[in-house]
């Protein structure tokens, strides 16, 4: 940590980490991990694995900072910052605060006048949006859909008439039911893209209608991390005509689309 004048506060750095492959880490991330003295990590094992994969020797004191402890550990981290200690905030994958811990600490630091900066990098949201082939000029990120059925139905009903492309996170085991509910609220023919295991060895990008994708997801276990992209009302994929010309089926539930045969899992 650089020398500071007495009374000068530390800096909170939000560090984006790879969403799949360790080698996607930026040189700046490698440098910051190497020199960090305090790391607030969603999963301490994950940050140690990442450091080992990057041949980085961690010298930092690592503080566990996940959803269940975020509220009670924020004051302590804020005190560290106010005492002049820099804090590097990392999550399991992607950017802190985006469906991951970080918001509370950032809000508290901002209110206290702490300097906050970002070490930009991978994001499953923009990665999925970019490869989807759906319009990218306007979009909304919806995170994980609500767990309670009533809340989910209300949320989907509100979004059904939205003209923006929608991006969701979902687990593999809930994907089929989510796609079925979206088909009921948004229309069976609404275009969507399932992005599974983005940037990883078993990455899969599957395009189709909500109904077709729901049928595919319901036909076998879908494993891995899912980012779902759904077209806005009245908006179509810019590559839809190309997909048809290469023989891809309109419904992914029968023959799959351009990125490979139907996949039942793993």
Model-identified regions with their sequence ranges:
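Glycine-rich, flexible N-terminal cofactor/catalytic loop recognition
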Residues: 1-67
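A contiguous loop/helix-start segment that scaffolds small-molecule binding in enzyme catalytic cores
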Residues: 2-10, 61, 85-86, 164-165, ...
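Short beta-strand scaffold positions
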Residues: 41-42, 100, 169
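Alpha-helix capping/helix-boundary segments
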Residues: 45-47, 94-95, 124, 174, ...
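Conserved helicase motor
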Residues: 63-72, 145-149
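Glycine/small-residue-rich loop that forms an oxyanion/phosphate-binding "nest" at active or ligand-binding sites
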Residues: 66, 73-123
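Class I SAM-dependent methyltransferase SAM-binding "motif I" and its flanking Rossmann-like core
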Residues: 103-162
């Amino acid at each position: 940590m650089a020398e500071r004048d007495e009374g000068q506060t530390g800096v909170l750095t939000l560090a984006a980490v790879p969403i799949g492959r360790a080698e996607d880490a930026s040189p700046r991330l490698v440098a910051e991990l190497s020199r960090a003295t305090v790391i607030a990590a969603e999963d301490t094992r994950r940050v140690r694995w990442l450091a080992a994969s990057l041949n980085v020797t961690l010298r930092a004191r690592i503080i566990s900072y996940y959803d269940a402890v975020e509220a009670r550990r924020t004051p302590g981290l804020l005190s560290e910052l106010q005492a002049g200690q820099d804090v590097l905030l990392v999550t399991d994958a992607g950017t802190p605060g985006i469906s991951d811990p970080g918001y509370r600490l950032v809000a508290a630091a901002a209110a206290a006048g702490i300097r906050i900066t970002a070490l930009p990098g991978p994001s499953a949201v923009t990665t999925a949006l970019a490869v989807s082939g759906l319009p990218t000029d306007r979009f909304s990120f919806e995170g994980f859909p609500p767990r309670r059925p009533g809340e989910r139905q209300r949320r989907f009903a509100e979004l059904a008439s939205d003209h923006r492309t929608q991006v969701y996170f979902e687990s593999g085991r809930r994907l089929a039911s989510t796609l079925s509910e979206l088909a009921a609220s948004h229309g069976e023919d609404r275009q969507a893209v399932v992005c599974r295991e983005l940037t990883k060895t078993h990455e899969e990008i599957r395009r189709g209608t909500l109904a077709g994708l729901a049928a595919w997801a319901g036909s076998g276990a879908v494993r891995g991390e899912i980012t779902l992209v759904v077209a806005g009302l009245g908006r179509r994929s810019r590559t839809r005509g190309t997909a048809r010309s290469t023989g891809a089926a309109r419904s992914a539930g029968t023959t799959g689309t351009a990125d490979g045969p139907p996949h039942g899992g793993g």
